[in-house]
Amino acid sequence: QELNNQYNEQVNSHEKTEKQSKNWTTLKSLNKVRNFYKKELEEKGILKKEKLNRKEMDLLQKYLVSALYTLQPPIRLDYGNMKVISNKKEDAGKVNYLLNKGRNKKSFIFNDFKNKKSMGKREIQINSKLNTIINLWLKHNKSDNFLLNSKDEIMNENALSKYIKKVFEPTKKDITLNLLRHIYISENIDLDAMKKQKKLADEMLHSADQQVDYAKK
């Protein structure tokens, strides 16, 4: 219980933990990692090759994973165990999918994720930048597994967690999935404004959600 209380106090203070402070970086720095992989692929001529060896496939997959977690809001490890389908009829409603309808039309279907009970099935359209990178990957990954481990089998969530750390090694920081999400949220949310909203909601004896409903432009 005491540990729980300490954790909640830490979260509510909005202060970084010691470990977070040590490894904290910026979105700009994370984007640089993605651009680093792109440059590596271009300089090695990998993007123009028809067939890639294992090392080249791994470099391309690192580029893909860096893009998955920087070109859109970073989800948890739900790309682990993800399958590739081309038709919604193939969605059995149990696992997560990359729905590949065509070269310019793709989406992620999430059936299995942490908040599935309260949120239900989610479909997220893929933006054009990420779509281009996925196309490069699918040109060489002909399996129905979205991400691959070192044995060319489906990458599970545990393996993806370790892989993310390897992908972001160029930052010289220990970048975990959790830290990635904290960095992204911190740069996209006005914390002072949110604190002000919460204080006002407390003083008016209603929830912050209700307050948003009440607010008019």
Regions found by a protein language model. Give the residues of each.
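Conserved tyrosine-mediated DNA breakage-rejoining catalytic core shared by Y-recombinases
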Residues: M82-S128
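Active-site/catalytic core of tyrosine-dependent DNA strand-transfer enzymes
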Residues: E123-L180, Y184, I189
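N-terminal DNA-binding recognition helix of tyrosine site-specific recombinases/integrases
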Residues: Q1-N35, P74-I75
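Non-catalytic DNA-binding core/recognition domains of DNA-processing enzymes
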Residues: Q1-L3, I126, N178-H182, M204-S207
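Short, polar N-cap/turn motifs at the start of nucleic acid-interacting alpha helices
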Residues: K173-D174, D192-K216
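Short, basic/aromatic-rich helical patch in the C-terminal catalytic core of site-specific tyrosine
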Residues: V65, G80, L177-D192, L200-A201
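A short, glycine-centered helix-capping/turn motif at helix boundaries
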Residues: D58-K62, L68-D91, L191-K195, M204-L205
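Basic, Lys/Arg- and aromatic-enriched nucleic-acid-binding interface segment
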Residues: N31-D78
